Amino acid sequence: MSFRFQTGAELPELVKHPTARQLVQYAGASGDFYEIHYDQDFARSTGLPGVILHGLLKAGFLAQLVTSALGEGGRLKTFEVSYRGLDLPGRPCRCRGLVRSATDGEAELEVWTEDPEGNRTTVGKATVELA
């Protein structure tokens, strides 16, 4: 295990640097071709500041945060997120987490993404089984 899951411990931060190209690639892989994720003009016509990250891409970033801390032998048991704000390509997306409780074999985590201003744009929780 590469991280010690103790109540109150912060998970090692993961910073992602999403690009417009990555959004197009993700659209192809996921089948989510909604134009707000790759067409600047369309996104702006809907009132957005420009193209935005796919919600499930941000969920994937958070799952990576958790599984990276978990290391080999552990298991992600439950995972859920709620989208609260926008993240834009070309701006860092910080993935953070906190151990809310830990027992001998399991830990409950709070996870979230932050924009560069420190606003939580995606919040969630996870349960992990420890090796």
Task: List each language-model region with its residue ranges.
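HotDog/MaoC-like acyl-thioester-processing domains
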Residues: 1-12, 89-131
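Hot-dog-fold acyl-thioester-processing enzymes
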Residues: 1-75
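Hydrophobic residues in beta-strands and at strand termini
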Residues: 18, 83, 128-130
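Acidic-enriched, low-complexity/disordered segments with a strong bias for Aspartate over Glutamate
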Residues: 32, 39-41, 87, 104, ...
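Mid-chain, well-packed structural core segment of small domains
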Residues: 66-95
